[in-house]
């Protein structure tokens, strides 16, 4: 059978597929001939940044991925971590940045759908979702439209599918004007002895297509996700996928039912690069070839070419290697759920990826070189430059109370209620903590006391100032947020969003952030078990803020002892665990400097990982023993914002003692490794004794009570006034009534 080609391969065609001249030469040397148009599309999909990680692979190997609880680390659809009693949590975070900018509703919706498939492909039932969203400046003409579409897409898919959204982030910065970020996280529960993998095994076994039919939506999506944007962005709208959450719900139930029959040898969801990537990954991992007959692929559009079928990113589809004797039983399950079930190929022993279409062989390629032996680059990067510290006399002053009121009602520090009230946070009936606290918490169904905590974190302005410290801080804050609920942090997933890696200064950000993330994960016993890299987040040469989002999972052994951020009662002591001298001192890169004075200079705060570990373990023990009544991590906005958020959540005021140092640094400094905790009067002595034994500074800095917040010698601000400011910004902005400078 001869290889059929339908289109001449020209330099322009090669370039339009995102392949560099040296990569095309590598293809010619690899296969010994000119590729067909379909083969060119396959190489483009598999060798692009989105699928091959060719610029990041070298550095990702530096991350710790193993631990006593890790069942499966990176390399599968999702990470798997043991949570005792024969149960495990399966989770991952992935980006859908480029599609969401072009078509916000469908881009965000299919981002949620894709991450849910990654989880249930492993045999887990999804129990929680989060999303970390970054938008451009609020006064940019597209921002309101993008926020509306993305939030509706996230909610529309997640709500219909039936998974609670328990946490996330929403932030604004002009650096995201041309490239928003939509990072979707999902977690599911499974039995530790019933995990399903994507590695194909056995020769001559049927390769089965499952789920929805294939259309032209998403053709070239993975290639688009590996390129910068320019003026032709609107032309890329057809490359955005279209999702159907109700079909995905049926696919979930059908897959989990099928998995109980013993029919599944290997299974892989069709995400980026669709049928191409799923088939190549299954075969390459198992050292097997794959032959596909595209005439047997269920399609919903007429006259689809082999190129379109191989690169379509139509949603709600799976590929499976099946035990032949289970074919009828498996087919009956999918027919019952109204889904397609078609044997579209077989495994082979020749390590070839062979595609047949209308009697022609349209592709015949070496499968290993397409998959796990794709090109790998060691791109040049520049040494890191650390900004000079701010001089003591270079800290601009402001009224402490006025600054607090402005910050709680600002774009980046106000309540996200407008967002999360569009998400179903309670479906499944296991949600214990909803968005707005330090972490979302979900009860483990079937267990009397066990719960899981989830958080996603990164502070891009820190990463921009110092990628190494910023990488450490993203991990530390995620670990701290989990700890603040009483959870033992188990493991993390990363979503590394950066600009163009071909620019040495951007590659430097990536390299140093990875080094910081790796060091923090090792110090905190918080391995990375899954993740995603999203590069080329640039428009016309303007890159985003470096945004390595960390999503973490923690285990709460007894959710009755879980901590919350809201003050529990009046007349309780407020203590600052991990307090530096003077309550706070690091004002550079703070939201105070950015949002009150418009300054983003100076170094990021240093993260002392030994201190972080010591304080976090101490606070977690206090929570487990019922010695504290409220806990909140101290991060963006410093002590002032932490106390204000605790007051707003509870309706109870607070009085904080006047610091001995500069009140601006004390209240708005963003020193790391700190928790605000409250303790009832009858427990103070016990807590102080523990702190003394542990060698931990735990000063009493104030007291709860009243209906206002007073910071040192500043004027009081009523809790109602704080709450009104906190709740007003988002609905006012989305209603179109907000002045741009707010």
Curated annotation (Swiss-Prot):
InterPro entries for this protein: PRibForGlyAmidine_synth_PurL, PurL_linker, PurM-like_C_dom, PurM-like_C_sf, PurM-like_N, PurM-like_N_sf
Chain residues that bind substrate: 95-98, 117, 241, 313-315, 534
Cellular compartment(s): Cytoplasm
Enzymatic class: ligase
Active site positions: 50, 96 (proton acceptor)
Gene Ontology biological process: 'de novo' IMP biosynthetic process
Main location: cytoplasm
Residues reported to bind Mg(2+) 2: 118, 269
Disulfide bridge positions per record: none
Documented EC number(s): 6.3.5.3
Superkingdom of this protein's organism: Bacteria
Involved pathway(s): Purine metabolism; IMP biosynthesis via de novo pathway; 5-amino-1-(5-phospho-D-ribosyl)imidazole from N(2)-formyl-N(1)-(5-phospho-D-ribosyl)glycinamide: step 1/2
Catalytic activity reported: N(2)-formyl-N(1)-(5-phospho-beta-D-ribosyl)glycinamide + L-glutamine + ATP + H2O = 2-formamido-N(1)-(5-O-phospho-beta-D-ribosyl)acetamidine + L-glutamate + ADP + phosphate + H(+)
GO MF terms held by the record: ATP binding; magnesium ion binding; phosphoribosylformylglycinamidine synthase activity
One Pfam family linked to the record: FGAR-AT_linker
Keyword vocabulary terms for this entry: ATP-binding, Cytoplasm, Ligase, Magnesium, Metal-binding, Nucleotide-binding, Purine biosynthesis
UniProt binding sites for Mg(2+) 1: 94, 532
GO cellular component, one term: cytoplasm
Assembly and binders: Monomer. Part of the FGAM synthase complex composed of 1 PurL, 1 PurQ and 2 PurS subunits.
Homology family: Belongs to the FGAMS family.
Role description: Part of the phosphoribosylformylglycinamidine synthase complex involved in the purines biosynthetic pathway. Catalyzes the ATP-dependent conversion of formylglycinamide ribonucleotide (FGAR) and glutamine to yield formylglycinamidine ribonucleotide (FGAM) and glutamate. The FGAM synthase complex is composed of three subunits. PurQ produces an ammonia molecule by converting glutamine to glutamate. PurL transfers the ammonia molecule to FGAR to form FGAM in an ATP-dependent manner.
Protein name listed in UniProt: Phosphoribosylformylglycinamidine synthase subunit PurL
Organism field: Sinorhizobium fredii (strain NBRC 101917 / NGR234)
């Amino acid at each position: 059978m001869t290889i059929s080609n339908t289109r001449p391969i020209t330099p322009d065609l090669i370039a339009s597929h995102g392949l560099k001249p040296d990569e095309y030469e590598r293809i010619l040397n690899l296969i010994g001939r000119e590729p067909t148009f379909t083969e060119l599309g396959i190489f483009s999909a598999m060798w692009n940044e989105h699928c091959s990680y060719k610029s990041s692979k070298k550095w990702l190997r530096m991350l710790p991925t193993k631990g006593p609880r890790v069942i499966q680390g990176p390399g599968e659809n999702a990470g798997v971590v043991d949570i005792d009693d024969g149960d495990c949590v399966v989770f991952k975070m992935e980006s859908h940045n480029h599609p969401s900018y072009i078509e916000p509703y469908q881009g965000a919706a299919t981002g949620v759908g894709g991450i849910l498939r990654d989880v249930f492909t492993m045999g887990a039932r999804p129990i929680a979702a989060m999303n970390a969203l970054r938008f451009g400046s609020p006064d940019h003409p597209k921002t309101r439209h993008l926020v509306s579409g993305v939030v509706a897409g996230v909610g529309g898919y997640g709500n219909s599918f039936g998974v609670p959204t328990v946490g996330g982030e929403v932030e604004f910065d002009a650096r995201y004007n041309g490239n928003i970020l939509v990072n979707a996280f999902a977690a599911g529960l499974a039995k530790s002895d019933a995990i399903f993998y994507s590695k194909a095994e056995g020769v001559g076994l049927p390769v089965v297509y499952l789920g929805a039919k294939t259309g032209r939506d998403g053709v070239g999506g993975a290639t688009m996700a590996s390129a910068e944007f320019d003026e032709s962005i609107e032309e890329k709208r057809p490359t955005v996928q279209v999702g159907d959450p109700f079909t995905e719900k049926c696919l979930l139930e059908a897959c989990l039912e099928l998995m109980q029959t013993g029919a599944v040898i290997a299974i892989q969801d069709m995400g980026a690069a669709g049928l191409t990537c799923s088939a190549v990954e299954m075969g390459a991992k198992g050292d097997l070839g794959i032959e596909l007959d595209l005439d047997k692929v269920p399609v919903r559009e007429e006259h689809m070419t082999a190129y379109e079928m191989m690169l379509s990113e139509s949603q709600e589809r799976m590929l499976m290697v099946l035990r032949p004797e289970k074919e009828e039983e498996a087919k009956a399950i999918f027919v019952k759920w109204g889904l397609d079930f078609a044997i579209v190929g077989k495994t082979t022993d020749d390590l070839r990826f062979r595609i047949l279409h209308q009697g022609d062989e349209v592709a015949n390629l070496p499968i290993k070189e397409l998959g796990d032996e794709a090109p790998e680059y060691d791109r040049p990067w520049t040494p890191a430059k650390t900004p000079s510290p701010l001089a003591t006399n270079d800290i601009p002053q402001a009224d402490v109370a006025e600054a607090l009121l402005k910050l709680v009602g600002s774009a980046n520090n106000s309540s996200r209620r407008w967002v999360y009230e569009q998400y179903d946070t309670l479906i499944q009936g296991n949600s214990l903590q909803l968005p707005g606290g330090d972490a979302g918490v979900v009860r483990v169904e079937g267990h009397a006391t066990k719960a899981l905590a989830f958080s996603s974190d990164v502070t891009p302005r820190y990463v921009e100032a110092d990628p190494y410290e910023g990488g450490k801080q993203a991990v530390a804050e995620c670990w701290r947020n989990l700890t603040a609920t009483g959870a033992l942090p188990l493991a993390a997933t990363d979503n590394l969003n950066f600009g163009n890696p071909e620019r040495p200064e951007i590659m430097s950000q990536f390299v140093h952030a990875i080094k910081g993330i790796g060091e923090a994960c090792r110090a905190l016993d918080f391995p990375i078990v899954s993740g995603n890299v999203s590069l080329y987040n640039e428009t016309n040469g303007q890159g985003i803020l470096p945004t390595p989002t960390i999503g973490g999972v923690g285990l709460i052994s007894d959710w009755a002892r879980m901590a919350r951020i809201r003050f529990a009662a009046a007349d309780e002591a407020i203590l600052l665990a991990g307090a530096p001298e003077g309550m706070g001192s690091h004002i550079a890169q703070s939201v105070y400097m950015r949002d009150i004075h418009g300054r983003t200079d100076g170094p990021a705060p240093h993260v002392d990982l030994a201190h972080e570990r010591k304080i976090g373990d101490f606070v977690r023990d206090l929570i487990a023993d019922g010695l504290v009544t409220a806990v909140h991590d101290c991060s963006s906005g410093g002590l002032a914002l932490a106390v204000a958020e605790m007051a707003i959540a509870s309706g109870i005021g607070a009085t904080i003692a006047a610091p001995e140092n500069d009140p601006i640094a004390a209240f708005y400094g963003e020193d790391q490794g700190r928790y605000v905790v409250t303790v009832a009067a009858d427990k103070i002595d016990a807590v102080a004794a523990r702190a003394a034994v542990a060698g931990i500074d735990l000063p009493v800095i104030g007291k709860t009570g009243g209906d206002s917040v007073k910071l040192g010698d500043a004027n009081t601000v009523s809790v109602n006034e704080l709450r009104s400011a906190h709740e007003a910004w988002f609905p006012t902005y989305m209603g179109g009534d907000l002045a741009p400078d707010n």
